[in-house]
């Protein structure tokens, strides 16, 4: 695959790339690395899976992939005790493997990187960062409106992780953008290269809120049973005639139409009979109110259950 084709492939379902020209230069290298960090969370859901899809795309483009399990960062962010977070981390790693990353994917626990050299670099980076900048960087990452001192270390540590892991690309959801911009600013001042940053859209929660989140319960987990998936989608926010910011339509976009050119909507003849639609046709049909939300939900449930079957099977057998 040539460079322009690789960039186009990487750019698919991406909110932004900072900067595209830098990405093109990276693609010319024989050795190139991309990383993403996750706080250990109770359940790995479709929001996480969208990011893992991007890591698989980068893997296919020749990047060595590191999945950084940020247990210490989560501890600083008041997400639990270290013992609790370490247990959740084991489960999360199993989930990420279930999503189809290659065998050579590197999984690293944040607490394993706490060398004296790393701590010294954190101190140096802290001297280049104001309290206000650190707090702004945490705004979309923390649940709290006010931050303690430990939380202000979080974005500084994350910026240093990029260098410490020798990553050329930092991947994350849009909530990570301010931290990544901090990294692009302070790493060169410490004598290190700035990362290319790839930001993934945030999937709406099943309740229609801005973000699918383990803590809010508005998610579909990658190891949910078929019954759980169907129940969650049936209860999902899905306003009639509205496709924008509709979580059910988003699931169709990211997890059905990425592998299907058309989908089959099965319904009784008295309700219009079966439909076979492209994504564009589905959007138009739904916005014209020629498709009932329940027919949409039933169809998306069927395809999503099928899509997640390999992950469920992996989780059951490993």
Swiss-Prot record:
Pfam families: tRNA-synt_1b
Gene3D superfamilies assigned to the protein according to its UniProt record, in alphabetical order: HUPs, Tyrosyl-Transfer RNA Synthetase
The keyword Ligase appears for this protein: yes
Keywords from the UniProt entry: Aminoacyl-tRNA synthetase, ATP-binding, Cytoplasm, Ligase, Nucleotide-binding, Protein biosynthesis
Binding site for ATP: 214
Enzyme class: ligase
Gene Ontology biological process terms from the UniProt entry: tyrosyl-tRNA aminoacylation
Motif ('KMSKS' region): 211-215
Entry's Gene Ontology molecular function annotations: ATP binding; tyrosine-tRNA ligase activity
Predominant place of localization: cytoplasm
GO cellular component, one term: cytoplasm
Binding-site positions, L-tyrosine: 35, 154, 158, 161, 176
Keyword Flavoprotein assigned: no
Top-level taxon in the UniProt lineage: Archaea
Alphabetical list of NCBIfam families matching this protein: PRK08560.1, tyrS
Subunit structure as annotated in this protein's UniProt entry: Homodimer.
Summary of the function given for this chain in its UniProt record: Catalyzes the attachment of tyrosine to tRNA(Tyr) in a two-step reaction: tyrosine is first activated by ATP to form Tyr-AMP and then transferred to the acceptor end of tRNA(Tyr).
HAMAP family: Tyr_tRNA_synth_type3
Name of the featured protein: Tyrosine--tRNA ligase
